[in-house]
């Protein structure tokens, strides 16, 4: 139902609108309704021996071609196989049947890459033994290149070096410290598809001898799905089911975003689906599950988790331009309800020694909060408090944040500290 807005002085009718400055979200199921394949464009005109030298020397000189990287990764990884112990399908695509032996690139459709292959510097000293660690190194640089925080970047690079040394004790990093030639590789769609295919394959074959290649690719799984991760984290930190957590959504914006994320048919809860790789496989250019597209849900969920003493939530990004006041109150009420009650019940017994609760106890005083986690009871109580946080609620929040130190700007932790520790 449309609402008519009129100017009082002359009854002029206007239709208020905002500019459409954001692209709509794209769902993975919609991609597969239009196409039944994920194309991967690779130049296969050069031998694996040549490509191995091109990549090795290119990394050392700081002038490696991403086309060489992709072609080498394909050549080095295409013979890796795994035997399925169950049927594997996703979005109507039959990847393989139980008993089939499949490879990494059975997850995509290989296409020839047109154009001239860039020149490279050969290196006859490189051997097939390099193929045991060089793909790991190239894929690991994807993970390193995704972060710009110097300390964390160094930690990841050190971890990658250690992974490679476990395969080759004489390994030395090929990219000098401080050089960031690989940061832009994530902009190449063929490279990211290889990353996604590798991770999806080894997620299925977790015990494969080459599963350590996931060191760098694991960040491809659920990329740009931070709000979905927030939902999962909130369920864990509260100990409540997905259904019960959902009943605690008290803001229209959060509800709208929850509906957006829970659109049926997207295989969110299917572990071996293409869905977790919707970004790197190119299934979506705007994830329906990102914190950018679900800022209110992300803020509410992470703030609630923080007030329940989650260490992970302190560094969650604080979104811009959301309705902080109502979202903060909703998060505080939810955290206070969970933090003020313990979901305890006897789980086992010896013989018939079972505790039976006494329901005949007297009622609560007018201002006493409910003892359980039922949102209906808590909303009724909150109405009696004139829909404003009580002093005890504010004290609860202050205790949750008062010990937080070293908080980064524009994080949930920083926001909560300034809001409650006054």
UniProtKB/Swiss-Prot annotation:
Instruction: Locate the region Interaction with the phosphoprotein.
Output: 350-390
The GO cellular component terms are: helical viral capsid; host cell cytoplasm; ribonucleoprotein complex; viral nucleocapsid
Binding of RNA occurs at 143, 152, 206, 214, 286, 317, 408
Q: Where in the cell is it found?
A: Virion; Host cytoplasm
Q: Which GO terms describe its molecular function?
A: RNA binding
Tell whether Transmembrane helix is among the UniProt keywords: no
Q: Which keywords annotate this record?
A: Capsid protein, Helical capsid protein, Host cytoplasm, Ribonucleoprotein, RNA-binding, Viral nucleoprotein, Virion
Q: Name one Pfam family in it.
A: Rhabdo_ncap
Which family would the database say this protein is a member of? Belongs to the vesiculovirus nucleocapsid protein family.
Q: What is the protein's quaternary organization?
A: Homomultimerizes to form the nucleocapsid. Binds to viral genomic RNA; this interaction contributes to the virion assembly. N in the nucleocapsid interacts (via C-terminus) with the P protein (via C-terminus); this interaction allows to package the L polymerase in the virion and positions the polymerase on the template, since P acts as a bridge between N and L. N(0) interacts with the P protein; this interaction prevents the uncontrolled aggregation of N(0). Interacts with the matrix protein (inner layer); this interaction contributes to the virion assembly. Interacts with the L polymerase.
Q: What does this protein do?
A: Encapsidates the genome in a ratio of one N per nine ribonucleotides, protecting it from nucleases. The encapsidated genomic RNA is termed the NC and serves as template for transcription and replication. The nucleocapsid is bullet-shaped with the tip containing 8 turns of a conical spiral before reaching the helical cylindrical trunk. Nucleocapsid assembly is concomitant with replication, therefore viral replication depends on the intracellular concentration of free N, termed N(0). All replicative products are resistant to nucleases.
Q: Tell me the protein's name.
A: Nucleoprotein
Q: Which organism is it from?
A: Vesicular stomatitis Indiana virus (strain Glasgow) (VSIV)
Lineage of the species this protein comes from = Viruses, Riboviria, Orthornavirae, Negarnaviricota, Haploviricotina
Which gene carries the instructions for this protein? Answer: N
